[in-house]
Amino acid sequence: MTKPTSTADKSLLGQTTPYCQAYDPTILFPIPRQEKRDELGFDLKTLPFTGEDVWTGYEISWLNLKGKPQVGWAEFVFSAEAPNLIESKSFKLYLNSFNGTRFESEDAVIACWQNDLSQACGKPVGVRFYRLDESIVLQGNLPGHCLDALDIEVEDYQVNPDLLHTDSDQIVSETLNSHLLKSNCLVTGQPDWGSIVVRYEGAQINHEALLKYLISFREHNEFHEQCVERVFTDIMRFCQPKKLTVYARYLRRGGLDINPYRSNYEQVFDRARLVRQ
C-alpha cells in the first residue's frame, strides 16, 4: 500500500463514504495550509497578504424541534491566517449531517457551525445564514478588463510562472480578469472551474503573458485556495507590483463553492456571484 504523501491524501476525497444521518462535527477534515505554503516560501509569520476564503453553501437544511425541515443558504468566511483549510468533501458531509437532526433554533445551528468550523481551521469563522424568503439578488460581473478575447497561442498546461513579464517600467493601476481558469483537485484530479481577478499597481503586466500563465493551471492539481496563493506569489515574484489583489470565484461542487481572496492592500472584497455560480 502506498504511503500517503500529504495530509490531503488521508482525507475522504476519492473514497466511497456513507452519508451521516445525524449531526457529527468529527467529519470535518482540516488540512494544514503550511504544506503548500512551504513550496511558495512563506509561513503564517511572513504572509505576504491578508485575505479570506468565502464558501457558499447552497444545500443547507435541518429539522426544527417538531421535525419540520428548515432550509436556506449560508456563507462561511475563513481567514487566510487560519492554520488549516477544510477539505471540501468533509465539509459537505458535515453540512449534510444536519439534515436529519433537530435543533431548537436557527441561532443554535449557526452556533454549531461557528464553533465546529473555528475549531477545525484554528481561527474564528464568520457565518452568514440567509432564509430563502429574505435572499437578495447577488449576481454580478467581475470588475475590470477581461483578457479572454486575446488571440494567443497556448502551449503550457502545467503552471509556468516564467511566462509572466512586464511590458515597461511605466507604473499603471489596472484590474484584469479571466473566466478561463481551470485547475484540478489535488487528490481526485476532478476539474475545478473558476473566474479570476488580478488588480495591481506597478509596472504594466503583459496581458498576453498573464492570460497564458492563468491558462497554464489547466492540468495543475491543487486546491482552490492554494491556486490563488500561487498566482499571488508568482505575480509578486516575476512582476513585482507595489500593490496586488488576486481573487477567484469557483463553480460549486457538492453544494459548495469556494471563493479565495488575497491582497497586500485591500480588506474588503466584492462577493457578487457570477452567472456560472
From Swiss-Prot:
GO MF terms, alphabetically ordered: preQ1 synthase activity
Pathway it works in: tRNA modification; tRNA-queuosine biosynthesis
Keyword hit for Repeat: no
Transmembrane regions: none
Active site: 185, 192
GO cellular component, one term: cytoplasm
GO BP terms: queuosine biosynthetic process; tRNA modification
Coiled-coil annotated spans: none
Top-level EC class: oxidoreductase
Binding, substrate: 86-88, 224-225
Binding site for NADPH: 88-89, 253-254
Cellular compartments annotated: Cytoplasm
Keyword Cytoplasm: yes
EC nos: 1.7.1.13
Catalytic activity line of the entry: 7-aminomethyl-7-carbaguanine + 2 NADP(+) = 7-cyano-7-deazaguanine + 2 NADPH + 3 H(+)
Keywords: Cytoplasm, NADP, Oxidoreductase, Queuosine biosynthesis
Pfam families cross-referenced by the UniProt entry: QueF, QueF_N
PANTHER family named among the record's database cross-references: NADPH-DEPENDENT 7-CYANO-7-DEAZAGUANINE REDUCTASE
General function of this protein: Catalyzes the NADPH-dependent reduction of 7-cyano-7-deazaguanine (preQ0) to 7-aminomethyl-7-deazaguanine (preQ1).
Subunit note: Homodimer.
Record-stated family: Belongs to the GTP cyclohydrolase I family. QueF type 2 subfamily.
Name this protein carries in UniProt: NADPH-dependent 7-cyano-7-deazaguanine reductase
Gene source species: Hydrogenovibrio crunogenus (strain DSM 25203 / XCL-2) (Thiomicrospira crunogena)
